[in-house]
Amino acid sequence: MSLYDSLLSNLQSINVDTRKKNADLKKLADGSLKFLYTNKNLSQDSLVSKLKGNEAFYKPFLFCCAKKIERHIYISLNSIQLLAINDALSPDILESLFNSLNAVIQLGQDSQLRVLQIIPIICTHYAASMKLPILISLFRICFNLHNSKNSVVSNAAAATLRQIVILVFDYLDYDTLAHKQEADLFLDSLSLFKGLCSLLSAGKSESLNVDHISTTFGLELLESILVNHHRLFQIPEFQDSVRKDLLPIITASLASMSDFPVALRISRILNIIFQHYVTSLTLDIEVIFSFIISSLDNSEAAWKKALFLEVLRSIFSNTNLLYLMYTLFDGNEGRKPIIKKLVTSLSRIVNEKPSVIGVGSRVVLADTFEDYSSTSSGNPPSSMEKVSGSFTGTKPEQIIGICRATILKTPCIEQFDKQEPPIIPFAYLVYLAMCSLASISNGIADFVFQFYEDVGKKEFTLLIEGIKCENFDSKEDSTARPQNIIKCQYGLISENWTSFLVAYSTFVSSALAVELLKFCLNSYVNFVSVCTLFGLETPRDALLTTLSNKAVPSNLLSGNMTHSASSSISHNGRLSTSTMFSVEGLKEAATTIAAIASYDSNHDEKQKCFSLREILFLRCLSSIAKVVGEKMGKGWKILFETFDKADIILNRSPTSKHLSTSSLNRVNSSNSNFQDSKSFSTLMDYELVSYKNELSELMYVTSSYSQPAYMEFLESLLAVITSSSVHPIQTLTAPRQSFNEDLLSANTKNSVYKTSANRSISGGIRLLRKSSEVFYSFSILETVCSCNLDRFLDSKLDHSGWSLISKSLSEVFKIINVAPELRTRAANCLANILVDVASRLSNENSPDSYAFQEIFFESLGMLLPVTEVSDNTSRGVEYDISTIGLEALVSILETVGHHVLHGWQYVFEMLRFNCLNGATCFGSEKGAKIVRLAFSCLQLICTDFLASLDTSNYLDLMDTLLVFCRQLEDANVSLTAVGLFWNVSDTLKNMFSTSDFSCAYNSVEDLYAFTSMKSKEILPEVLWIMLLVHLADLCENSWASVRNGAAQILFRIFNSQCSKLGTNAWASCCQLVIMKLLHSQPIQNVSDVNNKKDEDDHEQTSCLIISGIADVFSENMSLLLNVNGILDVLEEAFQLMLRLHSDIYPKICISNFKALRELSFSISEFGKENATFTLLIKLVFINWGRFCEVSFSERRLANISQEGLTLLIESVVFLLKAYNFGIEEIKDSLLQVRKAVFYEESTSFALDVDFLSSLQLAVESLTDLLISKFKLNHLVLELWSDVLTYAFNEEKTIRASLPTLICLSKKIFENAENVVENHSLDFLNRGTMQHMFESLLVPMRLKYRCPKASRVNQSTLPIWVLASKCFVRLMINCFKDLKGSDAIEDAEKMQCLFLLTVEATNSIISPNADYEYVWSLEDVFENEDVSSLKQLHNLWKPHLQLNCLSDEVAQYYITLCKGSFYYQMRNTEDMVISRSNLDIQKEAARNFFPSTESPVSNRRQRIAVDCFSILLDDYNSSYEHVSLTIRPILQSRLCWSLKRYVADKSVSGYLPLSKSQEMDMSTVAECLNNHPSLYSNPIHYLLRKAYHTTNASPVATSLNAILGQLTLKNEVLNAI
């Protein structure tokens, strides 16, 4: 509803209701309605403007109020309120309006309250019109209502009055600030303030026309004015009024302080005055502060002290006020040191009743405080003074300590509703006092920290030094410059730190809630930090020592010590160091009895593990170090000792039991909700983690420290490590008697504290540490060094701290009297630091880098064991130190080994020392481990970092390798170390220069002298020869495997890396290395050892040396031929080889053969011929013959392998290739070759059947060479003949023997024709051809007994077939050459060849005597034999009539005759072929003995047919001599068949003949039928007998008819 509508409605109501009752009112109402109707269409703003100019419009409402017309009062009041809200009242009517309202208040409560509601609205909108007369009217209304007995009205009136006063002063203050001050308004406000003061002091005020006001209400009004308008009271008139009118009231009230409501309000006003008017009211405030100090020090009521302490808490939370107070009082000569006295009073309150607050109980109270705090509002407090309590002022419970239950829920100074003073727990007073001290500390710290950050470290340090030297003038500027504030704060801290220390020490020793303890410790951190930044060393050390003793208290130390160590502790359970400072001595006596009285009866005096409070103390220390570590200086020592002790105890605490049971205490209140032990355990875990994290951050932040600060940090840390580990245990002194520190002079106190600060607070750490425990300081040192790696690269190494670190740590682990675990930890610490620092190593070739690497590896070299130890424990420690050092070296090399350019000598010295002394110091097992670990470093160097070494380093490296090769703890290490010589040699090879040695070195001594004198100028070639000398020395003076490995590596190096050596270098190698090897002990004394294993080892070494020397000569012949005396060296080598060449040393023998072969091969490949080369060939050839002679004749070696034989033959092959030897020399060599080929003791190879063995290949190569180069075909044919004869002798046909030379024989069969071609006559003349034919007859005779020609290819023809074919081809070749030379009539040659042919024919035709074996073959290869038979017969048939062959022709045909039979009998007499009729008759007359055996069929029936056919063909030939020779042979053959038939038939009877017998008889019948001339008497006789025998059987066969016909024909012929 709009203003117009509301006013219209209200006026209409008044108008209607008053028509008949009140004409005056109706008239006034009509006038107002008329005004509204007139301005009906105006806007609201225009309407308001019109209303302000029309005073008559308000008269209806004022009339109703003035006449107290009750029925219209509310409508009128509503209208007035509506007009005031819309600012539509005219200022001119305010006085009459307030008079009308004064009349209304007499009507009742509702009217009164409505009036009190309207008045502030009017005052707000018309503050400029609130002149004193009007204010008087308002005050009269309010005071009248305030005096009402109705409390509602009274309180509302008081509130309205307060609001009016504030509105008035607010308006004045606003105008003052806007420079629009009006004199009347100013004077009215001042009169109002004075009037209020007069009301309080005199009970009435004429200016306000008020004769009474309650003191409490008046003070509240004054507080309202002061608290909101302190800038207004900077005006002199107001300041004078405060001084003259208000302060007397306050002073008077302070003098009595009996009424709590008054005292409360006085305290609040004092707080305002202290906050805002201390500058203008200095003298008065000094008096008031003196009174407060007196009250705090005297036995005043607790509620009074609480009020003052709450005021002080507010004051000290204002840093600027603190600065002003110090400037006005403490810092101003002639003034009282107000702040110092206040701080002292606060400290006294804290220490006044230690038993009440549980000092010494070490109890953490459980509060309703989750995650450190949980206020009723749900937000955690931000500071100690903002912690909300739960104490309501009733009778306090018996609570020992300070927690929420002992802190007032509503501060005493805010309890306006209380008429009687509340009950104040003494713990609350202590809490307030500590809040004030904490506020001072926190306020100063906040300012100092910000200023320190703003100006920087350097400027701040200069400022503090100026303040200390009194060169800083704080009065040069009247303004509160930051520098002036810093000076004041410095003075405040330096003058009052003892009081702070005492208060802090007592408070943190109390039974506190977690949140209070944390807030207090936070303040403690700030205070110590400020002392540190101000350079106040004595206060800093005293504070740190106190906190350290509380972090690791005496009972915790004694609980973790052994019984013997605990005996050193004083009777009260505290280490003597706990009373080191006078402050502690003071507290000791003052708090012990009270603490024991409040202590839990179940508390274990010897606490084993940390409680929550100790963890919080530790975290406090870590926070201090984190905040001001750079300025800590010597204070680090205290911290490090404490961290060490704490770490030992923490590591002993079980994971699940961080908190001892005695560290928890609950408030005895059933109405309180507290945390269980699980919550505290979680809290403690969190604090532990935070503590460790802060320590980690502390270490990392050291990287930003300045160099002096860093060095102080480092020196303190190392001093703690050294003193705790090495120095003897100091005698603990007894606790000193307590004394009052106030009685000490400043100089005396400083002396006491400085002496105490320089004394170690951790004297009991060595008593505390148990076996196997180490100090946390080592870990700190490691981390700090890791964070400050760049410092170590400083060119000024003395300033980097590196020498100090290495020296201090080495002092710990080098002294055997130090505890083993500490020695090990110190070594490990140094190793870890070295590994971290190694990451900064650079390969920059600069003096700085050189110096740093030298000192770095020198420090690494310190990690060596002490050898003069005897007990097992010390040996174990030395072993650990060695292991640590070597592992560090491995890690360094793996990480940055490629950057290491200097300091290698320390590395090699370290490796040699461990290798030489490992077994001696640690025993064989651990010694082997050390050797392996050290060798891993050496191996890494030799594989990756050889390029970083200079020449002197190489000498150290080779000496180190020699040590590892000769050690006996680990064979694998020795062998691998030998192999590393190869890596070194390969690197040196790449460094070779093009220049040769200036001279040849003939002795090792000369070489050593040169390298030692000119180590920096030595050529890589000289180093390389030194390496070879080392290896040669290993070949002589080391155990077997190493000797062998050294020999192998030595000659590998020779062969692969010596191609760039000059003549003098080679001469040096020959004299210093090869000759040394030839005269070495393993070779020269190989036969002198007694042990078979040693003999084998020496033999193996000799083999390697022999083969190696041969390889050297072979691979480098072109260079060596230019070296003087090289043949003498080679001859020396041959003499050695021959001396050792025997059955006793088979390995040496084979090495000799290999050496010969290598030398021979190299000679064959050498393309340049000169005198030296020729001498070399002859030398080798002669020694080859010697070896053959020794092997096959003189000593007759019985175990030469096929490989050795092959090597021998290959050697001579290569020699023959290289030089044109004479025929006699070649013949002699072939004699030795035969011995090698036919060496029966050699193992045979079954695979020779299909493949040429190495020996056969060598023989083949030799024969090819003899044919191609020397044209000595006859020698080759002789050799082949011998091979065939040897290969197929009777001994080779037994089944237990393996075939040999089979494949070579097949090669001979294939190539013989080519060798013989065009040389047959020559070979016949030499007898070579006959020898060849005879050798071919050997396998032909064996026939089926020959070994298989192939085990792979079954289609390969048998050996005898191949031999037969070869025989035929050679025979044809001979005939060809004979005919070509017209020597076909040469009787001697023809006779010789025919005899060989007869024997060959016999071998082709006749099977072996072992028929059962022969005829069991699946294939008899008859076709091949038939072919060979025919070829030979056709070759000789034209020449059979020669007279020279007459004697051999009969034998030839007898051979054919024997091959013509179709069967054979096993157990009967052999067939006899007669050559005369008389012999035939005799043979026919002799009957065969009947046999029941079955005949063996001749599977070669074609042979039989062809042989018989040849006989018949030649019988019918034109050569009479031949025909006459054949006739008796055929007749004898026919007779034998008939006799056999008669004998077999007489036994078989009815049984039929075998097929072979039938074929044989059919052949006989056919022959007789076709050749009647063959009939003779024996044949007549046998035919008749056969016929009768056949007819005796009743079974008729076709044979019966044939025999019948033949018999009939026989009879006819016989009759003729």
From Swiss-Prot:
Q: Name one GO biological process term.
A: endocytosis
Which InterPro entries would you find in this protein's record? ARM-type_fold, DCB_dom, Mon2/Sec7/BIG1-like_HUS, Mon2_C
Q: Which GO terms describe its molecular function?
A: guanyl-nucleotide exchange factor activity
The primary location reported for this protein is Golgi
Query: Which residues in this protein are found as Phosphoserine?
Result: S43, S660
**GO CC annotation terms, alphabetical:** cytosol; endosome; Golgi apparatus; Golgi membrane
Instruction: Write out the annotated subcellular location.
Output: Golgi apparatus membrane
UniProt entry keywords in alphabetical sequence: Golgi apparatus, Membrane, Phosphoprotein, Protein transport, Transport
Q: How does it sit in the membrane?
A: Peripheral membrane protein
According to the record's subunit comment, the protein's assembly and interactions are:
Homodimer.
Q: Which family does it belong to?
A: Belongs to the MON2 family.
User: What role does it play?
Assistant: Required for traffic between late Golgi and early endosomes. Required for endocytosis and maintenance of vacuolar structure.
Q: What is this protein called?
A: Protein MON2 homolog
Query: What organism is recorded for this protein?
Result: Schizosaccharomyces pombe (strain 972 / ATCC 24843)
